[in-house]
Regions:
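Cofactor-binding active-site loop characterized by glycine-rich and histidine/acidic residues
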Residues: 1-140, 145, 156-174, 179
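Thiamine diphosphate
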Residues: 142-214
Length: 214
């Protein structure tokens, strides 16, 4: 199934996919230890750290292809990036290795994508650049989203991002007719119609062609 590997402010994302509601949000805020009320971690994680459960209560695997999956968020900025790469690589293995096609509770023959989220300030971290380069080399279905609000806490991006735009800085990663690479999109966060159209196109390319998309 599709997996998210994100950072610790994706409550809107999780609510949009139906994996978080208001009651669970406040249960996590007050560290509720009952997983019926706080399924992400039973109160063990900090606020804003989300995940979904891959196992049933009896320890058996859930069918991950029938649900929206999220790996557990962590606090170190850009720490989600190496895991994102691994999730995308797993999908490629499931597509290319016929011996794995029988594991239908995990993958539909590699028809999955790994969805990453990160803030623009954290793109200055080394783990971001290492992962982006590796995904381009490996050509894995990784859909990378950078939330660009212009600041990292209180530091404007002109002091931390070349050209003040991560998509501009990564233009050399754009694929062409002769060389493999990324498909890169840039869209205004306030333009909802354009967002829907861009994400539909980006996800379709990532899933069908099994290439990384920014």
């Amino acid at each position: 199934g599709d997996f998210r590997s994100g950072y610790y402010r994706d409550q809107t994302f999780m609510m949009a996919i139906g994996e978080l509601n208001v009651q669970q949000y406040f249960a996590a805020l007050y560290a509720h230890t009952d997983t019926e009320h706080e399924p992400a971690s039973g109160g063990r994680q900090m606020g804003g750290h989300y995940s979904t459960r891959s196992l049933n209560n009896d320890g058996t695997w859930k069918n991950l292809t029938e649900k929206k999956n999220s790996s557990a968020d962590i606090s170190p900025t850009a720490g989600q990036m190496p895991r994102l790469l691994g999730l995308a690589q797993a999908s490629k293995l499931f597509r290319n290795n016929e011996n794995l096609h029988s594991f239908t509770q995990f993958s539909n023959k590699g028809n999955e994508i790994a969805i990453g989220t990160i803030g623009d300030a954290s793109t200055s971290e080394g783990l971001f650049w290492e992962t982006m380069n590796a995904a381009g080399v490996l050509q894995v279905p990784m859909l990378m989203n950078v939330w660009d609000d212009g600041y990292g806490i209180s530091v404007p991006k002109k002091f931390q991002t070349t050209k003040e735009s991560i998509s501009e800085a990564l233009k050399g990663f754009q694929r062409n007719e002769k060389q493999k690479g990324y498909e890169i999109f840039n869209v205004k966060g306030w333009d909802y119609a354009a967002l829907c159209d861009t994400y539909a196109r980006a996800a379709a390319i990532c899933r069908k062609e099994h290439i990384p998309v920014l």
